[in-house]
A protein has these predicted regions:
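A conserved mid-protein helix/loop that constitutes part of the nucleotide-sugar donor-binding site
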Residues: 18-25, 178-198, 215
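A charged, aromatic-enriched C-terminal amphipathic alpha-helix characteristic of glycosyltransferases
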Residues: 306-341
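N-terminal subdomain of nucleotide-sugar transferases
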Residues: 1-42, 329, 333
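Short, structured helix-loop element that forms part of the nucleotide-activated donor/catalytic region
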Residues: 44, 201-229, 242
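Aromatic "clamp/platform" in nucleotide-sugar-dependent glycosyltransferases that forms part
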Residues: 258
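Conserved donor-binding/catalytic core segment of Leloir-type glycosyltransferases
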Residues: 4, 164-181, 186-190, 203
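Short alpha-helical donor nucleotide-sugar binding micro-motif in glycosyltransferases
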Residues: 237, 245-250
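Short hydrophobic beta-strand element within catalytic cores of glycosyltransferases
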Residues: 266, 271-279
């Protein structure tokens, strides 16, 4: 079977979407040929049965109309090179080319995992054979055709490493710097912990989109104004393949994104031996109560940091076991089975 994969970025060094390179590698083991159409192409080392076509954003920003035209031309030109279509995250591609795929009798499958959605999401989903997401609270979870999937983490990369020193009472935030990720709540929690005499350090890894640069700058300014610059450090986003050692160096990973997103970083951190505190309702259905974000964030952090060493290790082992159920190998197999029906 031949598959067309449509995605934003193919670049193994991209700090946000670099993980998808690993997804394509995993999927390639199940298909005779994979054609990828991406908005932006960067560094990649994909198998011989994978061919990448870019809409050209790596050469500079053009109008949406230009990209839409290029996309339609490619989907038509390459029509004999694929039997099924898998669109990752961006419903816009289905809204642009769904009518063409229907004429060509190509079944379409959409991956969309986010709490937000609208009537355009509904229109895109209506043309799909199946819709995939990982969260029961995703906007797309409401459709009868939706299938809940594993998050898809590469356990060959994400695993504990005793050679890396884990810093006691260290907290990690790793995500885009955006209001929806709530990094400001972590800063507020650290202030409250400091006032209680609880000593912690926090590392915040991630870049901001252009529309959130002012927000990111305000966080840095807040840290300076509060005199927390020796406690809270900011770092640029790094490629997904470089994150394991960052996870391994921290004791607690914090994710306070709204339910419906179910960030895969939760399970990457768990697989690397972090104690993970997350606000996601999906996550809280899987883990012991000690790892829930309840009441205030600072109370949740203090609770997990003051657990006996034996209990911490018990929770780490539990989390590592849960992360194995969310593996990329399992995800790629389930996607293949669903798309091949």
């Amino acid at each position: 079977m031949k598959l067309l994969v449509v995605t934003q970025v193919i670049d193994q060094n991209d700090p946000v979407l670099g993980f998808f390179h690993q997804w394509v590698v995993a999927l390639s083991k199940h298909y005779d040929h994979i054609t990828v159409i991406c908005l932006k192409e960067g560094t990649h080392s994909l198998p011989e049965n994978v061919q990448v076509f870019s809409l050209g954003k790596e050469n500079g920003n053009l109008s949406k109309r230009v990209y839409a035209s290029r996309f339609l031309k490619l989907t038509w030109k390459l029509r004999t090179q694929y039997d099924r279509v898998f669109v990752h995250m961006n419903q816009e591609y289905i809204l642009i080319a769904g009518w063409l795929w229907e004429i060509l009798n190509k079944k379409v499958y959409m991956w969309r995992n986010h709490y937000a959605g609208n009537w355009l999401t509904d229109v895109a989903a209506s043309t799909c054979t199946k819709v995939f997401c990982t969260s029961r609270y995703s906007y797309t979870a409401k459709y009868k055709k939706t299938v809940i999937m594993p998050v898809g983490i590469n356990l060959d990369i994400f695993s504990p490493d005793p050679a890396v020193t884990r810093i006691p009472k260290s907290i990690l935030f790793l995500a885009r710097i955006a209001p929806s990720k709530h990094p400001d709540l972590l800063i507020d929690a650290i202030v409250a912990l400091k006032q209680k005499g609880v000593t912690v350090t926090a590392s915040m890894y991630g870049d901001a989109l252009p529309e959130h640069v002012t927000y990111a700058d305000s966080l840095r300014q807040k840290v300076l104004q509060l005199g927390l610059q020796d406690i809270v450090t900011f770092h640029a986003g790094i490629p997904n393949t470089q994150t394991p050692d960052v996870y391994r160096a921290h004791e607690v990973f914090i994710n306070i994104s709204q339910s419906g997103m179910f960030d895969k970083t939760i399970f990457e951190a768990a697989a690397c031996g972090c104690l993970v505190l997350a606000a996601s309702k999906d996550y809280q259905l899987l883990v012991p109560e000690e790892l829930h974000v309840t009441q205030t964030l600072e109370e949740s952090i203090e609770r997990v940091l003051t657990l006996p060493a034996e209990k911490k290790q018990e929770l780490v082992v539990t989390l590592e076991g849960i992360s194995r159920t969310e593996s990329l190998a399992k995800l790629s197999q389930e996607l293949f089975q669903q798309i091949s029906k």
